[in-house]
């Protein structure tokens, strides 16, 4: 029975309760005690109460620690037995749920796994024995403010003492107001104090949380409550704990005295936080605790005076889980991140990073998101205490980094991009780590800004792109200051013709270094050569930029225009597209007297050109691309397929144009594969347009199931050349390059096979019929079931001996695998650029909750291991542990000779993740597993 509050509820909220209780016996068959009253609301707004006949109350329900009592006489033995039964304290449970309240922990809304529905199982971790499921109840989703919500009370028996203004309830007592509900075996409600006392099997529910206890005090007008000997549950977050007492504030904040916090199952005490005072705030999604110990199996393993932790997936300001590690570069390192939740659309994180060998590095980032843009600012500063590099050229004691990344739209057509990073010295990323998102450790860091405009039939782009060196073993690249492009198609198509155009204007500049170089010991770096004084004494090492000669040292402006006309003809059975393109390029070059003198010396070599300040190049390109499409329905091993046969014929003619006088600003030769058979330029970039007179033939075969799933794809092709390819990179003479004089290209093969959606195999293979040898090839096998992504197997092999490389020691381009340096040089390595490697990785469950993790990457060319690691993972419902032993090749610039900077390193890595709290140690494990094992990120994203 329920009655809504009268108008004066705020002043006398218990009057309703008293009246409700007094009225309850009229609607039940229970006999009620003497001194009970039947009460009705009078016409004047007061209460009209009449005494009822006397009678004995039925016995109160017995609960742990409570003696049965009644207004009548009872047997002394019964009273004694009840009084002797004392409740078990939560502190005696050692982090587990109280079995004395329910053997199956149902008092915590725990539902065993076998009783969960399919939808509930989908939200439950694979190694969890069940889940906390909030039972459906009236008002559980009520959002009405409490001061506007009526109060509903139900009980088997009720009694009201009008003079004392006390209402007594017994038997399945339920009080509900808005979304909050209180349950108990019995209750006393005090009208004068707006207060209630609950006894026996107390449960207080509100907004996905549950507090269970022996007794409780509740403020009926505000919802404030105190529950003694309490256990609590937050259902969606899989959080539970206990406390000597729990206080629930009016705003639903829960405060625990001598409380615990864990995400483990009720029967597990694998880990828990135990603190003097714990506060859980469902409104913010975060909790705090003071004087905290992290306990594993009830043994303390870590202490902190304060901790700030999440209780759901929302953002909030506070400390993030710390991480610590050790390495030869930094020594012991401790990172204690602090997160600032400044607004829903922007935040910041501070990363104080203490390194025993280097001092305190302060790093931070600020992220923003607006209706039209997103990005981040970041910075870091360290006054380096390490002396390892103090004598090395380019080293700075005050080390810093700044970075800005931005993407935005000024309107629906105009877009902006910024990718800017600056560092104090080229050794920054080799010595120091960063936690900033999007900052990559590469040989060069970008300093780029761009403005893009998209029209209906064209795109325009203004780009400024510079580089900052993050190594001393690479040549300084060209900056584009600026670059303007304008590409598109004409909006009309007379007789089916398509008209297109590509235009570019760009300025290339770089400042080549020519100062002396010294290594970390202060000695001349002799890897590239030495500089001597007039007396023949060595005074320092040569810069790697000094290996550049002649026109390779030039700066310049490049203007390029490439209009085209094509006639695409398409049908369901095939296509035919003749195309004519005309490429005009103009160069204005700047070269100092030293470079001009070197260019004059090199001009005697047919592989090099001469210097001209102004160069014009005109090259027509004619191509015909065609293909047919055949398909049929077939069946294999009982499965229906649509089998296709797709032959393709491509003819390309590009006349020879001498381009030896043009420097390479942004151009290189592409690697040969099946796709290159159908390109109109074998170079990537504008500075070289390869002469061609060839006919390429390829064919593709596919097997496609009725549902669109491609089971298999096989492609094979070859090009037939009608003349030699004379255009080459500087230093390469086509007359000494066999594949430039061959009449046919290598056979190019590609193959893909999907055993099912879990097993995949990919391969490519290029075989040279002239040398009867393999030019390049790879094979990759990947297994990861969709229904169990915890299983991963990768096995791959790569071989390549046709790489076009630049040798910084000689300043020349080389064909084939390529040696580093020349025979007789101190740092000479034969076939340094040849690739012959295998890569095997696996993550595999061996028994429930235990998985092995391994990777082995081996270089057969130099008979060395590039990376090897092995370990195991233990995963449970509430915590995860990984222990991995790892060997890898590290790179550190101690000289300008790339091979000498490679060194083996070794480490043992431990990662512990407390689910619901975060990683305690070993967060670095995530990075090398993600980079080294294909499928690892998918596995983690789908993990509980």
Curated annotation (Swiss-Prot):
<dbReference type="InterPro" id="IPR050218">
    <property type="entry name" value="LptD"/>
</dbReference>
<dbReference type="Pfam" id="PF04453">
    <property type="entry name" value="LptD"/>
</dbReference>
<feature type="signal peptide">
    <location>
        <begin position="1"/>
        <end position="33"/>
    </location>
</feature>
<comment type="similarity">
    <text>Belongs to the LptD family.</text>
</comment>
<dbReference type="GO" id="GO:1990351">
    <property type="term" value="C:transporter complex"/>
</dbReference>
<keyword id="KW-0472">Membrane</keyword>
<keyword id="KW-0998">Cell outer membrane</keyword>
<keyword id="KW-0732">Signal</keyword>
<dbReference type="Pfam" id="PF03968">
    <property type="entry name" value="LptD_N"/>
</dbReference>
<comment type="subunit">
    <text>Component of the lipopolysaccharide transport and assembly complex. Interacts with LptE and LptA.</text>
</comment>
<dbReference type="GO" id="GO:0043165">
    <property type="term" value="P:Gram-negative-bacterium-type cell outer membrane assembly"/>
</dbReference>
<dbReference type="GO" id="GO:0015920">
    <property type="term" value="P:lipopolysaccharide transport"/>
</dbReference>
<dbReference type="GO" id="GO:0009279">
    <property type="term" value="C:cell outer membrane"/>
</dbReference>
<dbReference type="InterPro" id="IPR020889">
    <property type="entry name" value="LipoPS_assembly_LptD"/>
</dbReference>
<dbReference type="InterPro" id="IPR005653">
    <property type="entry name" value="OstA-like_N"/>
</dbReference>
<dbReference type="InterPro" id="IPR007543">
    <property type="entry name" value="LptD_C"/>
</dbReference>
<feature type="region of interest" description="Disordered">
    <location>
        <begin position="52"/>
        <end position="102"/>
    </location>
</feature>
<comment type="function">
    <text>Together with LptE, is involved in the assembly of lipopolysaccharide (LPS) at the surface of the outer membrane.</text>
</comment>
<feature type="compositionally biased region" description="Low complexity">
    <location>
        <begin position="64"/>
        <end position="82"/>
    </location>
</feature>
<protein>
    <recommendedName>
        <fullName>LPS-assembly protein LptD</fullName>
    </recommendedName>
</protein>
